[in-house]
Amino acid sequence: MCQRLCDDFQRAGADCQCIHGDIRQSQREKTMQQYRDGKLAILIATDVASRGIDVDDVDCVINFDVPAENEYYVHRIGRTGRAKRKGVAYSIIGNFPEKAKLDEIAKFSNYQIKTMVLGADGSLTEEEVKVPAPPKRRFR
């Protein structure tokens, strides 16, 4: 998934590289140095490969999953907005258990998490996402 996403970005003309477990450590280190030096606009990393990344100037983090641990999520998005800079984090979720987890993280971290809906045309709109009520049981 990580490599495929990177390939898609590159085909679209984006200056992008990725790091994941199938890439040699020497190549990961080279890619990280390019990113730190500002020679690379977009870095895509798997969860495991991203651990230990220390980069000061990150404008945006996009999460394709929600970590199980609240602290890890806060650490992951904390890469944005360091040194009084502004940053933004997006989390792409596709089911209500992940939405509930984001709500839990918002309470834990005291962050405001805005919910937006991705339309079929690629547009983002602010809409309240309502969790469907559980079916009512009938007792006889």
Predicted segments — roles?
Residues 1-131, 135-140:
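Conserved helicase RecA-like core
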